[in-house]
Each structure stands twice: as C-alpha cells, then as structure tokens.
Amino acid sequence: MAVSMQVDIVSAEGSLFSGKADMVFAQAADGEVGILPKHTQLLTQLKPGQVRVVSGDEEDSFFINSGVLEVQPSVVTILADTAIRAEDLDQAAAEEAKRRAEDAMEQAKSDTDIARAQIELAEAVAQIQTITKLRDRLHKTGLS
C-alpha cells in the first residue's frame, strides 16, 4: 500500500480541500516547498501563490493569497486567508487587479500606500502565474 498523507486546505470561507495526497507543493516565504508523507514537522508562512496537491496521476491546484502551512508526519494543513481553486480564478479580473495595483503604486503618497499596493500587486501577479501554470499543465495533458 502506498504511503500518503492527509491534506486539508481551509480558508475563512470554509474547507476547500480535504483528502489523501502523495505530495504537496506550496509557496513558502523563503521559496517553494515540496512535502512528502512522513516529512519532518514544519510550520511556515505562505506567500501569494499556487498550492498543488498531487495524488497519483491527479493534481489539484489552488491559489492562496497568504496563510500558514503546518506539517505533521501524516497531516498537512494549510490555513489561508483566501483560497480559490485555480480553475475558478478569473484571468481578466486578475489582470485588472494588477493594473489597478500598478496605478496605485504610481499614485502612492505614503509608505503605507506603497506597501498596500505592493501586496495587491503581488497577489494579482501570483494569480496570473497560477492561471498560466494551470493552463500550461492542461495543455500538456491534452485537457485544454
């Protein structure tokens, strides 16, 4: 029997994913992490980006705007401020959010305004990257 782990992705809106997986990839503050079953315990902050949950030949993809990744030997929990299934992301809305954030950065008058615009820009860019990666994966597998 193959070794797997329980993966739970939870946001303020509720549980988005709960199931067994062979591997999880997430965008941690210091770079991408890959988690396998029986991984050493870990607690790390997540930055905006894609989370991939791999189980056999299946892969579920999500966008996380920020949150925390907790790893126990047989359980991975992601607590996210916002989590969206990658296929539910709206590219036009993400492009518009990116444009608005870039405009806000140009018009920012304080450090707080700049920081807020940088966060919004990072989230929009991460959404666009998640959409692009999902589209590329679907194209490679012939599902597009």
UniProtKB/Swiss-Prot annotation:
| Topology with respect to the bilayer | Peripheral membrane protein
Asked whether the UniProt record includes Membrane among its keywords, one would answer: yes
Give UniProt keywords alphabetically.
ATP synthesis, Cell inner membrane, Cell membrane, CF(1), Hydrogen ion transport, Ion transport, Membrane, Transport
What does this protein's UniProt record list under function? Produces ATP from ADP in the presence of a proton gradient across the membrane.
Q: Which GO terms describe its cellular component?
A: plasma membrane; proton-transporting ATP synthase complex
Q: Where in the cell is it found?
A: Cell inner membrane
Enumerate the CDD domains for this protein.
F1-ATPase_delta
Q: What name has this protein been given in UniProt? A: ATP synthase epsilon chain
